[in-house]
Amino acid sequence: PILDGKFEILDIIPEGAKRPNFSKFVLRNDINGETFECMPVGDASTRQSYLINKDKFIGKIAFAEFRCRSGVKEVPSHGNVIKILDNEPTRLPNNNEEES
């Protein structure tokens, strides 16, 4: 099954040594606050633009699709950022934070 969710964008980093100009998103897990990495969809210029303009996206909410939650930390895996949501709160509630 394909699952989806909304995740806070913590950072946008280079994809790796083979494609350092392409972006990879660092996201906060919606169920426990752990972090995970997720590749964006899009053509080469879109994926480069996320990295070049990362300050415009950090703190926003990403909508991502993924295949499963993996490991002890239950982070989404085998997923992609589908789009950036502009009309969402800039911070999602974290289930681990105590209410004051």
Residue spans for each PLM region:
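Nucleic-acid 5′ end/cap handling module spanning
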Residues: 1-75, 79-88
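Acidic, low-complexity intrinsically disordered tails
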Residues: 92-100
